[in-house]
């Protein structure tokens, strides 16, 4: 019949070929490569920190000397003033140009070997109060945590920016805490101490110091802060 003729004349439609499925942009191989890159960067950063720490320890082993009686008396008076019963080890060290607090679980205070020749008793007391305030605020532990974060998140510029800004805030907070109890004359003495220490070169990176930055704008900012009305009472301002 007509139906049979129509069926015989109707073109046979062949099935369309299956479209190729899109290839994934992010494959297991690329994920493995990124993980390997992250681990390599983390290992490199950790190695750099360990190298710096070992270099500091070697320098301390060969260049540290006991402090003199004058410095020790001023240090004892500062500890008593700040209510610090457990005194940190205090050593003089050649090769550094600013008082500094080492970073880690067992901190110690390092003083330049010629500090008694460059600072007055009042200026030396200001410098020691600053480092002891770092210790009271546990800044050495915060600094250790920041270093660990830069190991894990070495690829993230926000972490590095946060570390830089927190370090600035740690110094500003210490300045504020030390100068809060000082009168105008004593604050000027503290500012003169900052300027005297900022004029020296900086070569040590594994410590927290009163004037370890070599930037003039940091010196100006902190000297202005000494005479500012705002006093930060928090250990550090968070971004």
Where on the chain are the PLM-derived regions?
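Intrinsically disordered, low-complexity proline-rich regions
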Residues: 10-16
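Membrane-embedded and juxtamembrane structural elements of multi-pass membrane proteins
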Residues: 4-8, 20-239
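Glycine-rich phosphate-binding loop
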Residues: 1
């Amino acid at each position: 019949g007509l139906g049979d003729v129509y069926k015989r004349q109707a073109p046979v439609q062949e099935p369309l070929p299956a479209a190729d499925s899109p290839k994934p942009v992010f494959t297991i191989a690329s994920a493995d490569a990124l993980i390997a890159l992250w681990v390599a960067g983390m290992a490199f950063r950790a190695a750099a920190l360990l190298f710096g720490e070992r270099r500091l320890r070697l320098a301390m082993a060969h260049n540290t000397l006991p402090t003199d009686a004058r410095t020790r008396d001023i240090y004892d008076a500062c500890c008593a003033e700040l209510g610090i019963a457990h005194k940190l080890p205090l050593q003089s060290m050649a090769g550094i140009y600013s008082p500094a607090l080492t970073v880690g679980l067992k901190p110690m205070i390092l003083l330049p070997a010629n500090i008694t020749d460059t600072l007055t008793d009042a200026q030396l007391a200001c410098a020691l109060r600053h480092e002891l305030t770092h210790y009271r605020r546990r800044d050495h532990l915060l600094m250790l945590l920041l270093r660990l974060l830069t190991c894990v998140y070495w690829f993230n510029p926000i972490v590095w920016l946060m570390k830089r800004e927190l370090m600035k805030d740690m110094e500003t907070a210490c300045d504020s805490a030390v100068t809060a109890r000082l009168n105008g004359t004593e604050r000027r003495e503290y500012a003169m101490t900052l300027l005297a220490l900022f004029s020296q070169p900086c070569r040590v990176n594994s410590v927290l110091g009163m004037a370890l930055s070599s930037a003039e704008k940091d010196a100006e900012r902190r000297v202005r802060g000494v005479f500012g009305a705002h006093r930060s009472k928090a250990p550090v301002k968070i971004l």
